[in-house]
Amino acid sequence: MSTRDHVKQSPMPVQEGYPRSSKEFSPPSSRSRKRTWVRNLTMSLLIAAGAATFSKYIFPLGSILGAGSLQPIDPHDYAARADRILSTTPLIDGHNDLPYLIRLETKNKIYDHEKLPFEAGLLSHTDAKKIRQGKLGGQFWSVYVECPADPSAGIDDPSWAVRDTLEQIDVAKRLVDEYPDLLEYCETASCARSAFKKGRVGSFLGIEVHDLGVRYITVTHNCDNAFATAASTVAAGKPDHGLTDFGREFVKEMNRLGMLIDLSHVSHQTMRDVLSVTNAPVIFSHSSSYALSKHLRNVPDDVLRTVTKNGGVVMVTFVPLFLKVNDPASVTIHDAVDHILHVAKVAGWDHVGIGSDFDGTAVVPKGLENVSKYPRLVELLLERGVTDEQARKLVGENLLRVWSKAEDIAYAIQASGQKPNEETWSGRKWTAAADIPMPSMFNDSAERRKQLE
């Protein structure tokens, strides 16, 4: 059993000496009544003193447990309930494109606070003030780069993708370091919880490099790669081939590393293929319900049911086109609520989360204009009958459970002695400098080198 598993307390045993019936009870003497009174008074004083000491050191955990959070709340005071939920459970957003917006508008320069007034306020969806107003508890910062401009470019063709990805990882980490009172860089689920208890927003990276701190990989973006078919490819009328043979090996290696597999942006067949291969729960970092809006970026109900079996989580996005493909201009916060409730109805409350895509879309729903609006979203869900416990699962507990489970599976795989995967994709090109004299490792080295040409 993982050390992360909650320890279940056994039922309280029946205490010996208690009368089993009224017939076994005999009134105490006056002397015993006096001893009992003194003993009870002493115990009451000790308990009161202990409680005061306990509350002194435990309750003031930053913004986590304020004195008012333990007071009863009117069940119809949805705003107060939402506030308490977000003060005690980290709301973790699965996808925010602020690092890419910084790239576009400041060329990744963040230290001049007049040119990038992150603390004073930005016109876009995310800044320090909005984060505090929205009670954000954790954020996966997207460090993606775009697909090549030339659609015919293959995976072996030279491009700037690796360079730019490394730059995006760098700027995201520097942004976190620049605002240490607000943000805290994390690579584990336990760190995310710890940061929240300190009143900081756990900050995680989402793309494709584990040793550089990245903790989830979106299998494709808006173009196919060596691993799988993208949703945009199918939307363009091309075949849905799903996961490639190399993609299957890729999934196994992600399981070994403990990286979360993100199925947003992939085709429907890729979703099904990955779910048939992975040993770890998956995430959809920013997708919604296909049953409610027939956009190929959304998740069909049969996949939602498979996610339930897999143990994963679908994090509902706020992109209007995904919420109402036939009328995106009319989308409001209530449409986001509808998608959350549908995913919860089909997959269960253990398998739904929030993945806004703030700062990655020019248009947002009315009522969900930026990061500060999370409390209102939770409030509306409570008005629709969602329980506090269900809301806690939605805002962060589900994602943290999935993350911890992926880590546990990786520990087990690595403890078994499984080596890193050495497979490569079909048609992989290798290059070698033919004019540089090198020693030979084998008798047939010359033939081996010709195969690289």
UniProtKB/Swiss-Prot annotation:
Substrate binds at H221, R297, D357. PROSITE patterns: RENAL_DIPEPTIDASE_2. Residues 1-33 are annotated as: Disordered. The keyword Signal does not apply. It comes from the Eukaryota. InterPro entries: Metal_Hydrolase, Pept_M19. Glycans are attached at N370, N443. The keyword Transferase does not apply. Its main location: membrane. It is found in: Membrane. Gene3D superfamilies: Metal-dependent hydrolases (3.20.20.140). Zn(2+) 2 binds at E208, H265, H286. Zn(2+) 1 binds at H95, D97, E208. Its EC number is 3.4.13.19. The chain crosses the membrane at residues 41-63. It is a single-pass membrane protein. Hydrolyzes a wide range of dipeptides. Belongs to the metallo-dependent hydrolases superfamily. Peptidase M19 family. This is Putative dipeptidase UREG_03382.
